[in-house]
Structures are given as C-alpha cells and as structure tokens.
Amino acid sequence: MEKWSRYNYMFHRNGTFLLYNSLSNSFVELSEEDYNCISECISRCDVNGIDDDLREDLREIKTIVKNDDFEISKIRYTNLVRRFSNTNLALTINPTLGCNFGCPYCFEGDHKTSPRMTDEVEDAIIEFIKRHSLAKTLNVAWFGGEPLMEFSRIQTLTHKMLALGIEYKASMITNGYLFNVEKAKALSDLKISFVQITLDGTRETHDQRRYLKGGHPTFDRIIENIKLLAEHAPETSVSIRVNLDESNADRFLDIYNYVKNLHLKTVSIHPAFVRDYSDCANSCAMDSNNQFVFVKKLFEKHGMAFTSFYPSGNRIECGIRNMNGLVIGPLGELYKCWNDVGKEEKVYGSIFGEISNEEVLIDYLMGADPFDDPKCRKCILLPVCSGGCPYDRLQTLKNGESDTCPLMMDNIEDYLWYHYILKEKMINNKNK
C-alpha cells in the first residue's frame, strides 16, 4: 500500500507552493490546485485521491512510497558499502605536531617538543600505500601542527608518492605564515590544488587571536603570502576560513570586504563557526540558534550565501567512517580523526603495521550510527544528512553536550525558501 513519505516537507510562502523530499533530494514547485489536493489527501491518509498523472510524478521523486524503512535500508546499505570500499585511499599526513602559532582556542594543544617525521616513517608510508594496491586514487591532506614547518618533508614524500603512478590529489591546511615565493611556486609540482588559511578578522581582531608563540602579530605577513599564492600558484585555490564565535561574528563583513577588495581571482573567503569540545562554562562558541541568525542576516541583508541552503544529496559520510581514511602523525601513529591528533589515547595503530587499539578504530567506523538512532530515523533530513559529523556524534554519545544536527534541521522551511529565491535569481539573470 502506498503512502505519503515521512521524508517530505511541503509548505507555501508568498503565493508559492513547494514540496521537498530528502529520499530523492528533490524540490518541486506545485500549483495551488495540486498543493491543496495533496494536502487534503494527506489529511485523510489516502494518496489514492491524488490525480493519476500527479501521483506518478510524485512516485518518481519518492514523495509517495510503499515503505520508508525499506528506502532508508537501501541508503544504509550504500553507506556501508562505501565505508569498506578500497578504491580510494585518503591520508591526512601530519609531518609535525609543532606549530609556530600560539592560538588560545587550538584543539590540538601545545606540542613544544613535537618530533619531526623521519625518513623511516616516510618510507613506511610509501610501503603502506603500496599494500593498498586496489586503491585507484590517493588523496592527501597536509595537516599539523603547522605543515609548512616541514616543507622539505612534504616535498620528498610527495615525490615518492607521485612515483607510484596512482592518481594523486593534495590539499593543505595551514596558517599561511611561512609561505614564500619559492614554496608558492612549488605547489604546482606538489599537486597541491587547494590551500586553506585562517584569518580571524581584520588586523586588530586577528592579531589578538592568532599570534606567534612569542606573541608577535601575523596578519600582515599572512595577507602578503596570500597575494604571493595568487601570483605564483595560480592553479591552487586558496580558501580563507574565518573562525567565528560570539566575540568576533559581528565583524565578519569587515574582513570579507577587505579580502574582496584585494581582487585575487583564486582566493575565496567563508565563515566557520568555532566548536567548543571543552568543559568550559564560559565558552564563546555560538549556539545553533545564533549561528542561524548570523546566516539569515547575511542572506537577507547582504545577499550572501556562503554555504548551500540545499542539501548536497551525495550521501557521502566523513572519511573517518572509511577503512581507507586515516590520519598519520609524525611518528607514524595512526588516528581516525584530525580532531584527535596528539591525543595518545586516540591512537589506534601504527603505519608500521600493528593495530594497538581496536576499540577506537571500531568506534569510529561503526559507533553512534545514525541509522540505529530512533531520533535520526524519524528525521526528515536523515537521507541527506547521514547523521552529521561522526566525531560530534561520538562526543554526544559520551557526554551529551555536542549538538550534531545541521543548522537546517530547525530551520528547514527558511533554508528551502532561500534556496528557491537564489534559484529564481539565477534563472532571471540568465534570461536578461
């Protein structure tokens, strides 16, 4: 017997009638007549009263289904297949946990005596990749600590990985302070196509939050280095991340306009909300409601949309849920998530072969599964959300303090409406 899917969301605003379904990630505009007909049939729990042609269209986008649980089981099956797929190898490599910055909010803590990656560890990484002979692609993210402190290690290890002949892509998360012309020019040969650099605001705000270990400012030099990247690494996209909390969110537009006025084609800028994983009662982290107020204000007052208001629909979980996704420390120690880097209790093994903590490994692969969570299974966004960040889900399971639901969860109608407005603007602009 067919029924109205629980993964539908139907609403009207400003004389427009809209229907969203997360099983198919479809979003359609309805006539007022069809909207009223569907609403009446839903109230009677009888979809057979819907016109045959319309009912067939609704079947195609899964708004009418026989069994929602079966549809969710298919999605879960696909996720499990991906978790244990061996066609891609994703490595986050930390050549050092040391850093030249002394940022007070850094989740990694202070690694003043962090060892440097040795030739032995480098060779073990290459042998590890060779053992994964079924992998068709190799994706590397250079992380730390500050990866630019060990740029020579990045070069030697990259050249060895490229020599393996596997399809290769790389990115880097860096504070950007140690770039120079030589390093910028080298990015192309190192296949580093994406670099993320953090600025926490304009000069005054940034230098109060992101300073060198000795307390010296960093803003001006980072800006000059971003210009160097735009000039000498034109094939590399530079994304400026602005960490936001209650103390600096109201000044985001200042740094946004500053960067935009540099007119650098390969450079983009986006806000990112700082999460607090500590037990601090005086946290400056913005709660989900304030985050949405911020996003809403940017869109309604300034026409800015930094994140899509529409779910991607690719249903790809974070790489830590995949057996072939791992984080490598400078000693060859293995983690599943880069939030755990430097935490001895989160090391699950070694690049040299042995698994030392199966509990950590299995926890990340299978723990806090949203498909086992009654609240998630009833949630309209489960098919496109897949439970959100696995790290946050595990934290929630252990201490109940971290909210893992996406901002869209409590604001579905607004998000869909904003997406509709943007789509209409694009259509109108094309027709001009």
Give the positions of each predicted feature:
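Conserved alpha-helical substructure of the radical SAM core
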Residues: 73-185, 190-193
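Local cysteine-cluster metal-coordination motifs and their immediate loop/turn environment
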Residues: 98-108, 374-391
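N-terminal [4Fe-4S]-dependent radical SAM core
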Residues: 4-29, 52-92
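Short Fe-S-cluster ligation motifs
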Residues: 127-145, 402-432
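Radical SAM enzyme [4Fe-4S]-AdoMet core and its adjacent flexible, acidic
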Residues: 204, 208-323, 329-331, 343-344
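Short glycine-enriched, charge-decorated loop/helix-capping segments at active-site entrances
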Residues: 110-113, 208-216, 395-396
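C-terminal accessory region of radical SAM enzymes
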Residues: 285-313, 339-386
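Non-cysteine beta-strand/loop elements that form the S-adenosyl-L-methionine
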Residues: 184, 190-203, 267-274
